[in-house]
Amino acid sequence: EIVETGSDGLVLARHELPFSVRLGDFMLETYPGTTRPSGFRSVVQITDLDTRKTFAAEIWMNHELHHRGYALFQSSYRQQDGREATVLSVAKDPGQSIVFAGYILLVVGMLVVLFTRIQQARVVSAGLEQQAAARRSGKSRTVPGAVVVLLALLAASAAPAAGISTDVLRRLPVQHDGRAMPLDTYAREAVWTITGSYAWQGEDPTATVTGWLFDPPAAADAPLVKIGSSDLAGALGLSSMTHASFHQLADNPRLRQLTQDARHQAQEQRPRQGVLQDAEKLEARLMTMQEVLQRESVRPLPVPGNPKARWAVPSAVTAESLAALARGPRQPGWPSPEQIDREILYNQVNPVRLSWIILLVSLGLSVLGWGRPGPGLDRCAFGFLIGGFGMMSWGIGMRWLAGDRIPAANMYESMLFLAWGVGFFAVLAYGLLHNKTVVLNAAIMAALTMALTDLLPIDRFIHPIAPVLAGTPWLAIHVPIIMVAYSVLALGLVIAHMQIGFTIFKPRGFDVIARMSELLYWYMFVGSILLIAGIFTGSMWAASSWGRYWGWDPKEVWSLVAFLAYMAILHAKHAGYLARFGIAVSSILAFQTIIMTYLGVNFVLATGMHSYGMGDSPVVMWMVIVALAEATFLVWGWAAYRKHAASPAVR
């Protein structure tokens, strides 16, 4: 068969395998109590055509079968007319080990260059420090205005529902979304899903949900279901409302028509956007609310002898019956009391919020100590930075234990690792360099990331992961490496802005600009090494899952573009094509490729295996706003640079 590709032809030939493959059985595994796949595997019989020997084997995601130089992979499966069909792929790549060896050599080579640069920097550091000290001795110190940060923690009320203590009910184990959890966790997710708020009207989520359970008529008439958008509200004839009651929405003929149109487009495999997409989300919120009103959502009774079965609802869902279950003997299949207490503690502490508050304190102390003599404030700032990093680490660990997997499978969890990577690298860098700028820019970036993670309307709850992410160590290797790479490059972004800011407002700050430029170089160098290591580990993961280590997926392409952008800057600096200001500007521009890789592919392109399918997301608008703000800042910096171009520090 000939496939035309321009003036050339690509020949596709049929290749006979030296063995036959016969499917004996296909097993689709689901998360407990759901129909969501947790894994799927094929039981096959392999018959060697030369020796006629037959053996049985199993193939599942991330666990390929090797025979006579070939590898068989479980790619996917299909369900049609009530039958399941497995999809296997085959690969033969005798050069794979050579490719992987090349990966290792490239990373090792970059590390050798990094250590060489460090050694060269140490040779000249003594002289530079003496020159800087001489310049500082003739100048008076200036102290910038103090940054005053007002911190307020709002405690949610814990009003009991139906006269029963919520502290008893919140510890009741229930099954939801494929796992067992305390009622406290389910209540928080239900309240957020239905109302769009983590604490509806400031009330304890457990009290809110039990109130709905024990008084369904009042809950159905209360305007608490989030509509989702002003366009959808207008289409439903509810223009002035952000929330409506269950009855208002369930009986709305316009909503029924919109959801029917959305289902029709889904059957035709057409994307749903705008009002149709909002209507689908609203329908999902109504389904969640309906389960609560019908008392089908709280399932605390495991099925004996069947850990995968959906748990049962008590015959009478009353405050007394649920409290009796919570106080009674532990049911087989329930999490241990320690697991329940640990997850409730994680929910109540809210380590994400607490960490960015601690990091804000670190930022304030770092700013106050910037122009002051003595290391006191700097050490305090570093101490709070360690405290914020410790709280982030504790939160990630607790989430890992609750979900029984590394928390690195969705947007929210990736942002956790982004902020954690900033703190981790900053602690290491400050320990090595003792540079107060490290603490300042790390506190800025980590506090901003954790604040956005906490305040943006992102789903923060633990959900089942796709089969390709489960049962493999690559999730715990690839994602942390790539996110720490983004973290280090984000630190470089902050320091580049600080450097250009000094060019604008304090162009004669020779020492500070020089130190910032040097720090920016190290950030870009280390970040680039981590970035290529992340690309390589992702490639190895793809090779073990699908038999190919590069598929030109949009995320793969943009990761490569980002790496090449930073490599161009580093080579241009080494060749003398870029000076300090040019490096700072180039690093800000290069980070736009990181934003495109991290957010653009997921939310703008909305294509590829890494996409979250949100092509009309507000993220698009914010990316444009950020790009315009960056362009304005760079033009301002360029004007200041041209004005003070004679200064050696600015150059």
Residues of each region from the PLM?
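Solvent-exposed, non-transmembrane regions of integral membrane proteins
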Residues: 1-651
